[in-house]
Amino acid sequence: ILNQLGISLAVSTYQAGKLIMLRADGEVINTHFRIFPKPMGLAADHEKLAIGSTLQVWELRNVPAVAAKIDPPGKHDACYMPRRNYITGDIDIHEMGYAGEELWFVNTRF
């Protein structure tokens, strides 16, 4: 399905503290794991990826010039690099989404 749609899938797992990127690599699934402190909510578009973690929101931006340099050549069409970090305090961000250029999220910890 990922291959047919030409997409990747981002999955957060707060118990393991990881963001998992899944993508098609021919007929198999390729995974990339990155550590974030208690990642929960995610929001994405073609240019940005936001990750809500235990004390902050990370905003990553797609840098195509970097993607072109990742081995093996020609396999990666995007590379999301950290660009901003917003300190939120100890909250639980479960749902996130972009409304135009604004990032909105739902906090379930009061």
Regions found by a protein language model. Name each.
Residues 1-110:
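Sequence-structural signature of mature extracellular/luminal beta-sheet repeat domains
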